[in-house]
Swiss-Prot record:
Entry function: Its target is unknown, but this toxin may modulate voltage-activated calcium channels (Cav) or calcium-dependent potassium channels (KCa).
Keyword Signal annotated: yes
Protein name: Contryphan-Tx
Keyword list, A-Z: Amidation, Cleavage on pair of basic residues, D-amino acid, Hydroxylation, Ion channel impairing toxin, Neurotoxin, Secreted, Signal, Toxin
Entry annotated with the keyword Secreted: yes
Domain characteristics, as noted in the entry: The cysteine framework is C-C.
Main location group: secreted
Tissue localization of expression: Expressed by the venom duct.
Protein family according to the UniProt entry: Belongs to the O2 superfamily. Contryphan family.
Modified residues (4-hydroxyproline): 57
Anything else known: Exists in two forms, due to cis-trans isomerization at 56-Cys-hydroxyPro-57. The cis conformation is the major form.
Length: 63
């Protein structure tokens, strides 16, 4: 039982070290490289934004 505990602790230590080392290489080169959410209001706002860009046929609903 003691050997199994040591084995598990060593495995956890190795995996956490690997994750920390690999995580450092993922940084984007620029803050603008991160994709931004154009429609934070969800699907309904996305639909209304698409209608406004094309010329909305339902004027009262298109703000």
């Amino acid at each position: 039982m003691g050997k199994l505990t040591i084995l598990v602790l060593v495995a956890v230590a190795l995996l956490s070290t690997q994750v920390m080392v690999q995580g450092d290489g993922d940084q984007p080169a620029d803050r603008d490289a991160v994709p931004r959410d154009d429609n934070p209001g969800g699907m309904s706002e996305k639909f209304l934004n698409a209608l406004q860009r094309r010329g909305c046929p339902w004027q009262p609903y298109c703000g």
